């Protein structure tokens, strides 16, 4: 379409935030669990994308964009995508730790009733969380497209389902509570690194797709049980104190 790459990136980030807003708005208005809404809209969005693109890959991307994803820095050891990921972590850490809206997001997740009593609009914070999630998903999509060197609609659906389990596993391993109220940004990144190492290691020893899924699912189950136990003891200690 001849749109400059910088403007295209901004539009993609805004569109990702908008899709996240839809998820949050539907969840707030219907009361359906956000997990169900997100799974449903993932399939809907993929269907619309396939319809609009006719499942054809876009390979004629600007060289500056594709080179960014393939280049290596510091004697060809470090990808700029890794540096971008670390930068994103620092931005999120600052958001949750030092900004008013970040603290409100945490408070709304930790105790919605108490947050409402203190004047925080929990529904609004809930929608903001989904918008942030959509924004970060757009960032990940841009990074992946830059690394591959093409936008391939047919691949997006497979990646969405393939990354669904690791996307849940990384934050839980990193220390984020699934029930909300506690976010560990750097822990989540380390969890993502650990999940990637486990995933790649299983593929390297050629255990087969079934066993890769089996072990990742087993780790997720253990992590969720650990999350529940941590949540239980945290609430118990708060009651005692």
Predicted regions and their residues:
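Membrane-helix interface residues
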Residues: 3, 30-32, 99, 120, ...
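Helix-loop-helix "hairpin" substructures at the membrane interface of multi-pass membrane proteins
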Residues: 4-12, 18-23, 74-152
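Hydrophobic alpha-helical transmembrane segments
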Residues: 6-14, 36, 82-87, 127-131, ...
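Hydrophobic core segments of alpha-helical transmembrane domains in multi-pass membrane transport
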Residues: 13-16, 42-47, 84-94, 130-141, ...
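Membrane-interface helix caps of multi-pass small-molecule transporters
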Residues: 18-29, 51-52, 94, 98, ...
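Transmembrane helix-bundle core of multi-pass membrane transporters
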Residues: 30, 34-99, 125-128, 148-160, ...
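Cytosolic-side transmembrane-helix boundaries in multi-pass membrane proteins
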Residues: 113-124, 198-241
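Transmembrane alpha-helical segments in multi-pass inner-membrane proteins
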Residues: 137, 151-216
């Amino acid at each position: 379409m001849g749109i400059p790459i910088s403007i295209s990136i901004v539009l993609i980030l805004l569109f990702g935030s908008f899709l996240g807003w839809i998820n949050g708005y539907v969840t707030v208005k219907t009361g359906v669990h956000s997990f169900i809404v997100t799974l449903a809209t993932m399939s809907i969005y993929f269907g619309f994308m396939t319809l609009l693109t006719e499942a054809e890959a876009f390979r004629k991307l600007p060289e500056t964009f594709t080179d960014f994803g393939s280049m290596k820095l510091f004697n060809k050891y470090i990808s700029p995508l890794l540096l971008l990921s670390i930068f994103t972590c620092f931005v999120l850490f600052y958001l949750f730790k030092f900004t008013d809206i970040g603290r409100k997001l945490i408070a709304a997740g930790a105790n919605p009733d108490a947050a409402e009593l203190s004047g925080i609009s929990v529904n609004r914070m809930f929608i903001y969380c989904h918008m942030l999630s959509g924004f970060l998903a757009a960032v990940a999509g841009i990074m992946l497209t830059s690394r591959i060197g093409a936008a391939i609609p047919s691949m997006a659906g497979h990646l969405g389902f393939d990354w669904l389990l690791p996307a849940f596993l990384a934050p839980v391993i990193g220390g984020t509570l699934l029930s909300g109220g506690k976010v560990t940004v750097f822990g989540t990144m380390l969890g993502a690194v650990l999940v990637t190492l486990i995933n790649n290691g299983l593929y390297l020893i050629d255990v087969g797709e079934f066993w890769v899924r089996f072990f990742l699912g087993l780790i997720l189950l253990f992590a969720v049980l650990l999350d529940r136990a941590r949540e239980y003891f945290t609430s118990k200690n708060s009651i005692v104190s």
